[in-house]
Amino acid sequence: MKPSLFISLIIFNAFKCFCQTPDAESIVEGIQSSAYFGNAVSHAGDVNGDGYDDVIVGAYMYDNGQINEGVAYIFHGSEFGINTSPALILECNQASANFGASVSTAGDINNDGFDDVIVGANFFDNGQSNEGRAFVYLGSLTGINPIPNATLECDVVGANFGIAVSNAGDINADGFDDVIVGANLSVKAYVYLGSSDGIDTVETATLSNFQGNSQFGFSVSDAGDVNADGFDDVIIGAYKFDGEGLNSDGGIAYLYHGNALGLITSPATILEEGFYSTYFGYSTSGAGDVNNDGFDDVIVGEYQADF
């Protein structure tokens, strides 16, 4: 039987974090067994503009009229912490779509003062089997609007589009946040720009990799502004990329810079460790400015490394 997962949202005293195990501030749980609640989690920003940040949780095997349709839960923050009853449950109404396989804040894509969210459904069918889809939802005074502002897709059979979704920051510095979606089985990632109307459904950039089995796009993330030029950047992992020599499945991560036109499609930096089958790039994320030098930093996971 598939396990039912839960997540703990933890707030603790930073000065004590290395000497004792912190207690959970809140525990939010799914209401259906084998739904894989908690497979994907993210902060959601402040979706209702009340001054308290919110969270989003995916449960991609949830049955809600359709088998394994999947759902995503929005939980609102408050002065007492996270409300453990969901404010909203999002769904896509298609069986086996894997809706909620990935979830993320989208930033404020229409610059209305309310943060927005994006949800991936990597097995969604719309003319092509398992092409995948990503759904963008806008925040408002009452929270997330359950009707998507935009649905994004790539029209490629078996692309796994939506296996990874993320806010991309504001890559062209126009005041509207942008999003990025990975499609690892077609070794691509797609970047979409925000606007006053929401997300433009025509991608501004398509990023790709020359190795067909590299899993490029399995992980995608905003990187912050790594070169402090005023344009946000993105990072993409390809955890099965084969490097030189015996470096099979060593993995790699690519950093792309933003500019006034959108995103420069040639990588500015290529990161790798050069070890055999360590899956470098399985996870990627912006890290903030960890040394406070004015340049944002990144973090890359290498989950099969054994040192």
Descriptions of predicted regions:
Residues 18-307:
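Conserved beta-strand/short-helix segments
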Residues 1-22:
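Bacterial Sec-dependent N-terminal signal peptides
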